[in-house]
């Protein structure tokens, strides 16, 4: 595992999240905070199916990690009052693996496949027939004497989750009757999520402290809940157990999470780009060497948020720091900076140091 995966602002699921994250999951569409369009559309799909007494269309949920795709799959099963079977794309290496799982489904069950874009091709091709006709063809024997035996399966609803919808094949994507894209959350939505989580965990937190955590959570509930637990630890050990604004800020400083939600590696990349390469352009490989990381780590882990936050711009010649990046590091951007007009939502001005005096 990459060291950056253990960062408190990593959107990936960590072992430390464990059972605590499960206890914080919403149990119904009404409990689910955020994603209003997806919730409204899903409610219509599910309630329409219940009124008809049929199984709903297959559902594909896409979006970055940590936004609630697994929680939504659990809610779908709960709303339908049926069992949820959970697996993942990498676990389905052979068609037989999928056939065994499908044959054990009861009518109306929900089958959730996480990372469905990573499913093996033989299993994917078997899934086509299962999704359309609720049937699988099991091949018995090998060579010229092999025969295909059709096997009926109970009508079910497939819920697929993916962080890379573009990696899905066309035939698989087309078989989903409903596709919902999960967007990053607004600070106000994260604030409500944190207040709900604090109540469940028994954390005494002031509203402005919760707002501070929400503002550093990269628009991701998983990160917000993880930071809440880390701040709670700090408050219990070094304060009186109450999370106030000063306590929250001090705790987040200890865990190297700055005002924009950048961690140590993010800031190292930004600092190398601005101070080491005068704002760029510079290639990812060169930037990775400068911070002592693999190029894939910089490109896949750090860069997406830096670009989304308006701190880094991708150009044909390489990565370029925006005016917001210079200002976030407390520096004055050069006057001829091409990307100086890019704004960062929620960015506050800081004292700056002019390197060009």
UniProtKB/Swiss-Prot annotation:
One of its GO terms (cellular component) is cytoplasm. ATP binds at residues 24-25, 66, 69-71, 132-134, 175, 185, 222. It comes from the Bacteria. DNA binds at residues 314, 319. Residues 259-357 are annotated as: Head domain (RuvB-H). GO terms for molecular function: ATP binding; ATP hydrolysis activity; four-way junction DNA binding; four-way junction helicase activity. CDD domains: AAA. Keywords: ATP-binding, Cytoplasm, DNA damage, DNA recombination, DNA repair, DNA-binding, Hydrolase, Nucleotide-binding. Its EC number is 3.6.4.-. This is Holliday junction branch migration complex subunit RuvB. The gene is ruvB.
